[in-house]
C-alpha cells in the first residue's frame, strides 16, 4: 500500500477538504481517465483495491497511472481510552481529493475495456467518478 517514506512531522491537523481541483484535472499520461466529481478522503487501501480491480480487468493490456498519493496521516486513539494524554497514533493514510481531480489514467487499451475497468474501480471508491477521454488541442 502507498504511504510516504518519511515526513517532517508524523501527525497532521484535521483540516478541511474544500474547493475544486485546479491542478491534476486533465488526462496527462494516458488516453482515458477516471475523474472525481466530489470531495472525498480516499484511503491507501481503497486506492490499492481500485488499482487491483483495473489491473485484473485489463489483464496485461495497458499501462495504469495513479495520479493521487495518500500523504495525509489519520490518527486514532485506542478503544476505551479517556480523552487527553496527547494525540493518537497514525492509523492509516489518505489522499484528499477535490472535484475535477484525475485519480487513474490508462493507455494502451480500447475505450470499451477502459470504460468497464474504470466503472468497476469506481465501485471500490467512496465518491462519484466520471470516465473522461484525452482531448487533443
UniProtKB/Swiss-Prot annotation:
The keyword Cell wall biogenesis/degradation does not apply. The keyword Glycosyltransferase does not apply. SUPFAM superfamilies: Ribosomal protein L16p/L10e. GO terms for molecular function: rRNA binding; structural constituent of ribosome; tRNA binding. Keywords: Ribonucleoprotein, Ribosomal protein, RNA-binding, rRNA-binding, tRNA-binding. Pfam families: Ribosomal_L16. InterPro entries: Ribosomal_uL16 (IPR047873), Ribosomal_uL16_bact-type (IPR000114), Ribosomal_uL16_dom (IPR016180), Ribosomal_uL16_sf (IPR036920). Binds 23S rRNA and is also seen to make contacts with the A and possibly P site tRNAs. HAMAP family: Ribosomal_uL16. Belongs to the universal ribosomal protein uL16 family. Part of the 50S ribosomal subunit. This is Large ribosomal subunit protein uL16.
